[in-house]
Amino acid sequence: MSDLIIVGVTGAPVSTRVVDWAIARAVERRQPIALHSIVGGVLGAVGEDAVLVHALEATRALVETHAQRVRAAGVEVSVHVEAGNPIAVLTKASESAGLLVIGSDYRGPGSGKARGAHGIRIAAAATCPVVVVPDVDTGERHGVVVGVDGSEVSEQAVRFAAAEADRLGEPLIAVSVWTPLQAPRNDLAVYPELYLTNMQAATEEIQALALAGIAVDHPDLEVVRRVVRGYPSHVLNEVAADARLMVVGTHGRGAIARFLLGSISQEVLAHLATVTAVVR
């Protein structure tokens, strides 16, 4: 896997936090950074050329200010500014990257339904792990949360989260969520106690197996285990509200909790509680 960290830069305030996050990781792991900024909305309208030239120049100047901060930290950096579709360009760029870092309000400021839509689509399409950074100060928070469901992609998420927790000197908080089967006529949500007990036990076993190899690679890592009944995205965001980082998989095939981008992972990104990595 490439060591290159690609960073999506926009004019949104969150871009400063995005670049700062990437710098911190690059310094510790001696990784190069490529700053990418894409001017979208090109339609080929009459008179558009002059507007596009100005937009590209202004964007290049903006990105260069961030590049100066990267250089000041002693990190190798390259700058890439172009016109195009941000989702397509960053997705293509991810093919040569080890990590892609973007801001949560990639489409700009606001709080409507479109907020974060580009980030969700990029996380779904990128070929490398994607880190989505919210415009929130997480400096006083602690812990790295990871969603665990026993699937293959969940194993990748656990490995990524454990490495980050070790790097940051933070505890790894493993969260597994189970949800009782939904029956149309079970409106009162009444379930046999034996069933609930067995669901809890089965999920605990799945989590234990998923975490079994952590101590070998990270012998000094503190691991906190949480197995909770509930809805996965709600539980994950609740736990992550106090964490420095959360890690989820792009999809899952486990019977306990499926982290499907477009469902659970999408909901996590749409209501971002902290810096969140989506791993495939």
For the regions a language model picked out, list residue spans one by one.
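General small-molecule cofactor/ligand-binding pocket signal
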Residues: 34-36, 78-82, 131, 173-175, ...
